[in-house]
């Protein structure tokens, strides 16, 4: 009966170690930046790994007062591109911890 307790303690120790690794990797991921761009780099946006926008750059050629819709579309494209990169890196980094849990 005591033998089972040793295994349980070992398993708990491994779980705590894994949790610490996950926390450290998530923190490192949150510090990374990801830049997304619209076609021809007309709009670029930069996000952190925790999906906070840090910067937006709009090429002056993208600003046409007669075609605001185009600029809006470019911003959306750049934001979506950056967020896709964040999601892909998050899955790559953190996916090993959730593999088989879904």
Swiss-Prot record:
Localization (cell): Cytoplasm, Nucleoid
Gene Ontology MF term list: DNA binding
Top-rank taxon: Bacteria
Keywords associated with the record: Cytoplasm, DNA-binding
Record region (Disordered): 1-24
InterPro entries: YbaB-like_sf, YbaB/EbfC
Broad class of the protein's primary localization: cytoplasm
GO cellular component, one term: cytosol
Gene3D superfamilies (alphabetical): Nucleoid-associated protein YbaB-like domain
Family annotation (Pfam families): YbaB_DNA_bd
UniProt cross-references to HAMAP family, sorted A to Z: DNA_YbaB_EbfC
Family: Belongs to the YbaB/EbfC family.
Function: Binds to DNA and alters its conformation. May be involved in regulation of gene expression, nucleoid organization and DNA protection.
Subunit structure: Homodimer.
Entry protein name: Nucleoid-associated protein lp_0699
Annotated organism of origin: Lactiplantibacillus plantarum (strain ATCC BAA-793 / NCIMB 8826 / WCFS1) (Lactobacillus plantarum)
